[in-house]
């Protein structure tokens, strides 16, 4: 029989309606800059597409598991992408570097960042710098990637660069991702303008079902 409604879905719907929608309306009117922030961790490993055949196939796979980390900030309206990258790990300092980078753009309007609930993004260090730079941070509820616009961009990049692709060297792997990210505002603009619309699905009608 059906159980109770998912409380996290209610939180997502509430934040979308009371916070995101008004902020994005201001952004559309040119009164505010809204950036969606998230980190993607690209690992040099096989990313297989779909394949059906009668015989077993052996596919080339790169050795090692080197990572190329990208912390990105996606402008909700222009779809401009600003990044901090490394090959180690993303932490609070990475977020601070990104805040500084955007602050130095000297945008003549209030700036709001939409971030997920990762601990390094909501720590004291990040909050202190944001207050110092007069930047607003909006932390999304746990498990609500549907409200973070940049998640769609990461899926697009993986499809373009990783699925069913083989890279023998980490440098080639990294260059392919970097090249794709640099073309988001040019070669891929039409596709991304269609993908990155400000429509956010929530699941407030979902129920747990006991089978």
Question: What do the predicted segments below correspond to?
Answer:
Residues 1-211:
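Short functional hotspots at interaction and active-site rims
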